[in-house]
């Protein structure tokens, strides 16, 4: 409802090689987190139902944005409450795509899965084509998407941030902050 309102940018956290010390301003705003040791391996499944091929392509792009195996090996994402402090960096590897016939769910006791992993690239391509047709957005050249891909492919921001000490603002500093530069300007691309 404010005519002067403008977006100040995207919320993201720099990937760091070392954890950052917390800026303890007030005990009322502190949160405790439990940190897992490095190099933990987890296995999981995502079950989907009634997705169009394009919607499934979007889900697959969200899980692994790069199509080439070499680039997919360097992708990392950040999850959890520890992101601001350099924790929570994960890699999603070995994606397998299995499909079941929905009719079998109601006619058979043992529903058979069909491995369609080899179709992942074409399913992603179907989503990218639909994105272009319906919204005029080219996945490969859109600024927001390419900025996101740059962050996903960045191992850590140490090279980009240099030796400066980057800390997070205190609550009082948020009120009059200026918009940040575009991520590409900081990364230098």
Report the location of each language-model feature.
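Basic, Gly/Ser/Thr-rich N-terminal segments that form RNA-phosphate-binding interfaces in CRISPR RAMP
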Residues: 1-189
């Amino acid at each position: 409802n404010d005519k002067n309102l403008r977006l100040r940018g995207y919320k993201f956290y720099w990937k760091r090689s070392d954890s950052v010390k917390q800026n303890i301003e007030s005990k009322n705003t502190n949160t405790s987190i439990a940190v897992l040791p490095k190099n933990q391996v987890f296995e999981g499944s995502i079950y989907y139902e009634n997705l169009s091929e394009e919607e499934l392509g979007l889900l697959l792009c969200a899980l692994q944005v790069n199509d080439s195996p070499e680039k997919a090996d360097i992708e990392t994402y950040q999850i959890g409450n520890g992101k601001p402090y350099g924790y929570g960096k994960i890699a999603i590897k070995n994606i397998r795509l299995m499909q079941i016939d929905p009719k079998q769910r109601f006619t058979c006791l043992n529903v058979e899965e069909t491995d369609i992993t080899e179709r992942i690239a074409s399913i992603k391509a179907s989503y990218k084509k639909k994105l272009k047709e319906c919204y005029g957005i080219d996945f490969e050249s859109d600024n927001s998407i390419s900025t996101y891909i740059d962050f996903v492919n960045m191992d850590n921001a140490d090279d980009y941030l240099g030796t400066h000490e980057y800390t997070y603002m205190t609550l009082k500093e948020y009120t009059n902050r200026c918009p940040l530069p575009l991520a590409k300007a900081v990364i230098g691309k």
